Amino acid sequence: MKGIVFTEFLDLVESKFGLETVQQIIDQSELESNGVYTSVGTYKFTEMVSLLTNLSNVTKIAPNDLLKVYGLHFFDALVKNYGSILKTYKGPIELLSSIEGHIHVQVRKLYPDAELPQFETLEQTDDKIVLIYRSSRSLYPFAQGLMEKSFEHYGQNCEIQHELLKDDGSEVRFEILKK
């Protein structure tokens, strides 16, 4: 997992819960990296699971709720670091329909070893998009946060419904309606 995912996660934890909580979850997680991340490094997914689990235990907030908030936060990091890519899209539905065919292609150019989820567009109109999310990491709430924030970025509102196609969350159907 790319380091930017870790650095932004710890930034979010610090901004929402304080530096002491960051240190607490790092200490509790017994990380191979010792909690030292660079945005361009690559780290084990198990470290993120451990950090997330310990944050959930400390805050008493469900992991999926934390992941969704993190997705909302991470979109801002994408705007800051890769805003030029987002400017090529007129709106969130166009952006979301281009994840697999354009955005992930660009990510792979920058980070050839990145392990990205797959997004399949099943249906797309001016006001609706239906996507299938696939990832062995089952981070669909994170993806939902990113989707939600993409609408906000373009000054639009949306309603997102999801259906687990696999119980472990590795395959999820998202239906997103522009409001």
Locate the predicted segments by residue:
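Short terminal or interdomain "cap/linker" segment that borders an active site or interface and mediates
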Residues: 4, 113-139, 156-179
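A general alpha-helix detector
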Residues: 4-12, 50-54
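Short cationic amphipathic helices and targeting signals
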Residues: 11, 130-133, 147
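Short basic helix-loop element that most often maps to the first helix and adjoining turn
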Residues: 12-19
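Long amphipathic alpha-helical segments
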Residues: 20-58
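Amphipathic interaction/junction segments at domain boundaries or subunit interfaces
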Residues: 48-141
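Short, non-transmembrane amphipathic alpha-helical segments
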Residues: 141-155
